[in-house]
Amino acid sequence: MPLRSTFTRFFAMEAASGLLLIAAAILALIINNSPLSWLYNGLLETPVVAQVGALKIAKPLLLWINDGLMALFFLLIGLEVKREVLEGQLAKPSQIVLPGAAAIGGMLVPALIYWFLNRDNPPALNGWAIPTATDIAFALGVLALLGKRVPTSLKLFLMTLAIIDDLGAIVIIAIFYSGTLSTLSLMLAGACIAALVAMNRMGVVKLGPYMIIGLILWVCVLKSGVHATLAGVTLAFCIPLRTRNAEPSPLKALEHALHPWVSFGILPLFAFANAGLSLSGVTLESFTHHVPMGIAVGLLLGKTIGVFGLTWMAVKTGIAALPSGANWGQVLGVAILCGIGFTMSLFVGSLAFEPGSSEYAGMDRMGILTGSLFAALIGYAVTAAASRRNNTLAS
């Protein structure tokens, strides 16, 4: 009962967050295509400086959101992954097989489609990872519109798949989207990680020391050339889940505290800051460029083929079973919903094509918004139709 109650609360929060993300993205599109566009762009380009002694970090507001606030989002992802691995849906190998296979297919096929369409354009190939991402809040938000017509097992399947997908995105960012490395900063970051691990081993359960060293780690990683958001994941993996004296779990306490701030503050703010695509000069021909086409087709078709195809193979070979109470039509609908890349795709896109420094910076958003929109609409329609059929057969 506690597990179901926890999942219900989590699902409700993710669903509400998904709807808020949609509103934030629509608002950004409206403002950036109105007479107030100067205010929108001027606000995001506002320089913000943080200085302590000789240490100075100067970035426009947009990068403080993408590098700073999103580190808290990745901290939350890291906490969720650690909890799921130690005592949740990822704790038993048998529970990982189906969503794990689906997640792998959902990353490989979109990347291959994007590569195929852009193989003759080396600068554009830097965006290969953009369509590999799934926005868990947005996808669960759409699925929530179907209510009890969708079995809980299918919602758990989507949630677990998305968590594994997020873990894959973390690995991709660490390996493929890091800049020129600073040896000194990496050494200092290593010292911070060593201190965090030592505190974990010594049984330190107070969150304060972890957060202070985590902030220092973020600065070191930011200066090192590795993307700063990875500091959040590293910090999460060092926060203890269990305690020796039956005290409240530090990991669960931090996860509980962060969740509403990330879901209803950071992610909508990120969507508002990054989804404001200017439609000036955009024509139907713009969507035929291989970058937006590769992203949109990768999200809509690549995710569907990859997730559904690997799920079908896993079930037909007998290494996994369909989620209890679900039919193949519902699985197909969920596979299509996995093509809602949105915030995660926008984030990877900001790394692949930096705003203001790449000719593809606007094109990637065209592909992300188009692919995500069609994935949401078609995925909802397919899942709804399959759920009606399932309920009819059951009655």
UniProtKB/Swiss-Prot annotation:
Q: Which InterPro entries match?
A: Na/H_antiporter_dom_sf, NhaA
Q: Which GO terms describe its biological process?
A: regulation of pH
Reactions catalysed according to its record: Na(+)(in) + 2 H(+)(out) = Na(+)(out) + 2 H(+)(in)
Q: Which GO terms describe its cellular component?
A: plasma membrane
The regions listed as transmembrane in this protein's record are 11-31, 61-81, 96-116, 127-147, 156-176, 179-199, 202-222, 264-284, 295-315, 331-351, 366-386
The topology of this chain with respect to the membrane is: Multi-pass membrane protein
Disulphide-bonded residues: none
Function (record text): Na(+)/H(+) antiporter that extrudes sodium in exchange for external protons.
Protein name, per record? Na(+)/H(+) antiporter NhaA
Which organism was this protein described from?
Answer: Pseudomonas fluorescens (strain ATCC BAA-477 / NRRL B-23932 / Pf-5)
